[in-house]
Amino acid sequence: MLRLLGRVMSFLPMPPPPPPPPPPPRTPGGPAARQLSRRPCAPPAPSPPAASAAGGEKKRRPPEMLLSSSWPSATLKRPPVRRGPGLGSGTPQPATSARVPPQPSPGRGGTSTTCSAPRRVACSHIPAGSTASGTSAGAGAGPDDATRFSLNLTPEAILVIQRRHLEKQLLARPRRPFPTPSADPRLPLVPCPRTRASTLRRGGPTSVPNAPLAVAVSSRPPRASLLPGGLQATLPSPCPSSLRPVLKVSLLNEKHKYDDEEYEEEVEVVDEGLVRKCTEWLRGVESAAAARGRTGHLDSLPHLSTL
């Protein structure tokens, strides 16, 4: 590789000699301007010393460093990149070191432009995890970093995020407390007006000693439903004292579960054929009982032949 680079360097053309320094600029205006400059109040023009200083710097530079922007010379003369002990060959450089612009040396004018371009391009391919420290600092982050970042989510991920947000909102809402039943088993529940009216209309036992239990059974607390087995779904209380009142209510619900429903009496339909067969059967039985003493056992049952 070094031999190939030496051959390439041998075929490079010789650099031309440095150009002569530019002449000092002439002041416009001709002799009129010269006459004005001879006055004592006019300040001296500072442009000729600056031009002569620039010409002196160009003279001091060596002739071989003026045109050193070719690829072999730039890559050979560039110092190696310094890497920390934790960074390997495959890991990218941090964003803070990549965003710092390289300081151009006084003798290398063209190499700074050729080396800084690939470093800035490689900065955009650094993953988001490594650029987090650089963006949080805010010193080297520019306005183009915010526009460069883009987050693409699938529709399933968007639905999951929305569902979790709704669940958090529902959990954050204050819920109304449920009405707790009284812990004292001796206090009866408040009767429902519908069941009270139906009990009075039917003439139910109100003066019986078991009347409070019947009233307590017929009156169910709000939001309580009967289960298929006749048990009543009671709301959970924070401190259940005993299961005795719940047991009484469940047993009485099983006994009086049809109290709220009213049935109409059906009109009886008489089947004349069935009545006629029954009367004939009864007549045969009577005649058989009358002739029991004079005939045999089978002859006394004439109705069996009709079957």
UniProtKB/Swiss-Prot annotation:
Q: Spans of biased composition, class Low complexity?
A: 128-138
Q: Which residues carry this modification: Asymmetric dimethylarginine?
A: 186
Q: Identify residues that carry Omega-N-methylarginine.
A: 108, 202
- Matches recorded under InterPro entries: PRR18 (IPR031369)
List the biased-composition ranges (Pro residues): 13-28
Using the record's annotations, give every residue carrying the modification Phosphoserine.
Answer: 70
- What are the protein's UniProt keywords? Methylation, Phosphoprotein
| One of the Pfam families matching this protein, by short name | PRR18
Q: Where is this region: Disordered?
A: 1-142
Name of this chain's protein: Proline-rich protein 18
Question: Per the UniProt entry, what species is this protein from, by scientific name?
Answer: Mus musculus (Mouse)
